Amino acid sequence: VMEGKAVLFKRFADVDAIDLELDTEDAETFINAVQIMEPSFGGINLEDIAAPDCFIIEQTLRDRMNIPVFHDDQHGTAIIAAAGIINACLLTDRKIEDIKVVVNGAGAAAIACASLIKSLGVPHDNLTMCDRTGVIYRGRDDVDQWKSAMPSTPMRAR
């Protein structure tokens, strides 16, 4: 996957990219390895890291490093989803603050999509997120800290 993306980086942005893979499933080992390489690179594009490790790894690297860190699975997907919503609003003559959005899924990409969509002006109460169990609502006790930031209303109000 990253070899192809490296070609796109070069073709469309004239950015030289190198595909590096680390043989570890430990978040702290991964973070330390990437941080050690910082002086050699102008940016880091993370790929195929599952939640919740992707949130921890990306935030830790952003905090510790002086170069951009981008998790493609989260933010690349969110950018495309946001562009689609902006275009849909333009085509239907709606204001983004008036639309209601349902996000079906609650993985890293879905959470990043919801966060970006809200930052564009969709009110928190107009966004509903569902995972494999159902609607993520305020007070639901089986969600992690990232999912728990997403609910808009108590379940009984739905």
Identify the function of each model-found stretch.
Residues 1-67:
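N-terminal ligand-binding/catalytic initiation module
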Residues 55, 59-63, 67-80, 91:
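Flexible, Lys/Arg-rich cytosolic regulatory linkers and terminal tails that connect or flank
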Residues 1-13, 65, 79-158:
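Glycine-rich phosphate/diphosphate-binding loop of Rossmann-like nucleotide-binding domains
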Residues 47-54, 75-76, 106-111:
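Gly/Ser/Thr-rich loops at beta-strand to alpha-helix junctions
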Residues 18-20, 70, 128-130:
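Hydrophobic/aromatic beta-strand patches that form the interior of the parallel beta-sheet core
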Residues 22-23, 48-51, 72-75, 132-134:
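Short, ordered loop/turn segments at secondary-structure junctions
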Residues 40, 46, 69-70, 120-126:
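A glycine-rich helix N-cap at a beta->alpha junction
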